[in-house]
């Protein structure tokens, strides 16, 4: 698929993946070479993070997505061309891999023992591709405002765990939003332009 080909080198679009506990405890930080990520941005996201809910910040041509699982906050920062659902899918596979690797160690973890997580950094880039190939589906939606077809990234878990169908999602683009209704087979069952605020 052309959209997946666009992200063949997905790591070039990702600025940073940060895993930490509080303002003083960094567990893992993967950063793309020649990228400036300010520590204050990571600390702000860690303070704002909520359990089980992906939060988004968009500024300066970058998107930040973050979530808290137990006491650990997972953060990803990417170019604003990367859709939020793909960033969330990357965090999903990152959280699963992290807890699969370290869950037993985390219960006895003490602040200052962060060097034991160093090996996880080498797993992060392959997780980008895993998320892209296994955890998302691309659907094509037509917007009547801009008279164009758009490839929209949808997390498989979003549809598979939906409480009812069709599930609804808003694709924000070019200053407006397109509300899309998706069934359990990832087929579009309706769409309409909606107003956005925030």
Indicate where each model-derived feature is located.
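Acidic, low-complexity cytosolic segments
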Residues: 1-134
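Flanking scaffold residues of small Cys/His-coordinated metal-binding clusters
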Residues: 135-138, 166
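Short metal-binding segments enriched for Cys and/or His
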Residues: 169-196
């Amino acid at each position: 698929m052309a959209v997946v080909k666009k992200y063949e080198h997905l790591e070039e679009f990702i600025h940073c993946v940060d895993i930490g506990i509080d303002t003083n405890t960094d567990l893992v930080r993967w950063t793309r070479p020649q990228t400036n990520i300010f520590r204050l941005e990571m600390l702000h996201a860690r303070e704002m993070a909520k359990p089980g809910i992906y939060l988004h910040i968009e500024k300066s041509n970058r998107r930040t997505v973050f979530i808290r699982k137990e006491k650990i906050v997972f953060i990803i920062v990417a170019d604003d061309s990367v859709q939020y659902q793909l960033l969330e899918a990357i965090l999903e596979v990152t959280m699963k891999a992290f807890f699969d690797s370290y869950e037993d160690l985390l219960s006895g973890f003490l602040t200052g023992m962060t060097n034991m997580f160093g090996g996880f950094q080498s797993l992060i880039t392959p997780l980008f591709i895993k998320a892209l190939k296994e955890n998302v589906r691309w659907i094509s939606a037509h917007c009547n405002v801009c008279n164009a077809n758009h490839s929209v990234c949808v997390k498989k878990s979003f549809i598979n765990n939906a409480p009812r169908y069709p599930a609804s999602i808003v694709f924000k683009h070019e200053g407006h939003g397109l509300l899309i209704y998706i069934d359990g087979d990832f087929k579009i069952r309706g769409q309409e332009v909606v107003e956005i605020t925030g």
